[in-house]
Amino acid sequence: MKGGEGDTGEQAPLNPEVDSPAGSATYREFVHRGYLDLMGASQHSLRALSWRRLYLSRAKLKASSRTSALLSGFAMVAMVEVQLESDHEYPPGLLVAFSACTTVLVAVHLFALMVSTCLLPHIEAVSNIHNLNSVHQSPHQRLHRYVELAWGFSTALGTFLFLAEVVLVGWVKFVPIGAPMDKPAPVVPMSQVPPVTVSLSLASNLTPSSASVATTQQPPKACPPRQVCGSAHGPGWQAAMASTAIMVPVGLVFMAFALHFYRSLVAHKTDRHKQELEELSRLQGELQAV
């Protein structure tokens, strides 16, 4: 009898609540509750990600609108206020490059400004609603490409065009200063030449050699102010070259910073996605173990 009772005790389950209906219901509720908590956390993460994208789109549009308005206004003022010297022959292609660069700069920034003006009110209206589910009413997800295009035009392409605009304005403004005067003297028609009377006695006293010397000698042309006589370029050309020499390394620094910034941003996003995937795989392993 003792042995039988021992055998019966050994055959009893370790968790007696498993055979009871109440115990099995409690276990199922525990698993179900854990699943709901996991799904709720996932939904919360998706909603938080949507709100983050909304705020990021709003910040990009605000920055694009401010930058585009400032730079396009500067380009228009530069084109209107620049004074061209009519008696100076500009290098070939300089005025064409200045006009084309200014036009493209204004067009690019006006496009970014138009996108910001059209999308920003709708995003602002949704972001001011204190409701977590209202994020889906914003058009920033559907028009994400236009937001990125406006951001790229305003910050990347628009900035490089602005640097080129500064260089061209320097050339157009400073090149005529102190430039050598290579224009030929104007030809006066014979009908406008006043008659000159010379006495015969004075003409007879002049020898042929002295007359030729008198006709060939002309007063020397004065050099332009602040220019060394005999030099091919004036101080204006030197000032334009100085601005170009300064702006070229600045443009290279801008390009290097832009590449480094976007590379670091992509690396940061990649690390964040890896961490999220590792967390999901860990949660999946815990659920499978349960």
UniProtKB/Swiss-Prot annotation:
Record-annotated membrane-spanning stretches: 63-82, 95-115, 157-177, 239-259
Question: Which PANTHER family does this chain map to?
Answer: CALCIUM RELEASE-ACTIVATED CALCIUM CHANNEL PROTEIN 1, PROTEIN ORAI-3
Quaternary structure annotation from Swiss-Prot or TrEMBL: Oligomerizes in homomeric and heteromeric ORAI complexes. Native CRAC channels most likely consist of hexameric ORAI heteromers, implying that diverse ORAI1, ORAI2 and ORAI3 subunit combinations with distinct biophysical properties can operate in a cell-type specific way. ARC channels are heteropentamers consisting of three ORAI1 and two ORAI3 subunits. Interacts with STIM1; this regulates channel activity. Interacts with CRACR2A/EFCAB4B.
Q: What does this protein do?
A: Pore-forming subunit of two major inward rectifying Ca(2+) channels at the plasma membrane: Ca(2+) release-activated Ca(2+) (CRAC) channels and arachidonate-regulated Ca(2+)-selective (ARC) channels. Assembles with ORAI1 and ORAI2 to form hexameric CRAC channels that mediate Ca(2+) influx upon depletion of endoplasmic reticulum Ca(2+) store and channel activation by Ca(2+) sensor STIM1, a process known as store-operated Ca(2+) entry (SOCE). Various pore subunit combinations may account for distinct CRAC channel spatiotemporal and cell-type specific dynamics.
Q: Which Gene3D superfamilies match?
A: Calcium release-activated calcium channel protein Orai (1.20.140.140)
Listed under GO cellular component are:
membrane; plasma membrane
Annotated site location: Confers selective permeability to Ca(2+) ions: 81
Q: What is this protein called?
A: Protein orai-3
The reaction(s) annotated as catalysed by this protein in its Swiss-Prot or TrEMBL entry are: Ca(2+)(in) = Ca(2+)(out)
Q: How is its activity regulated?
A: CRAC channels are regulated by fast Ca(2+)-dependent inactivation (FCDI), a mechanism that limits Ca(2+) influx and cell toxicity. ORAI3 subunit displays prominent FCDI. Inhibited by lanthanides such as Gd(3+) ions.
| A GO term, aspect molecular function | store-operated calcium channel activity
Q: Which InterPro entries does the entry link to?
A: CRAC_channel, Orai_sf
Q: Where in the cell is it found?
A: Cell membrane
- What membrane topology is annotated for this entry? Multi-pass membrane protein
Q: What gene makes this protein? A: Orai3
According to the UniProt entry, which residues carry Phosphoserine?
A: 42, 45
| Family, per entry | Belongs to the Orai family.
Q: Which GO terms describe its biological process?
A: store-operated calcium entry
Instruction: Please give the organism.
Output: Rattus norvegicus
Q: Which UniProt keywords apply?
A: Calcium, Calcium channel, Calcium transport, Cell membrane, Ion channel, Ion transport, Membrane, Phosphoprotein, Transmembrane, Transmembrane helix, Transport
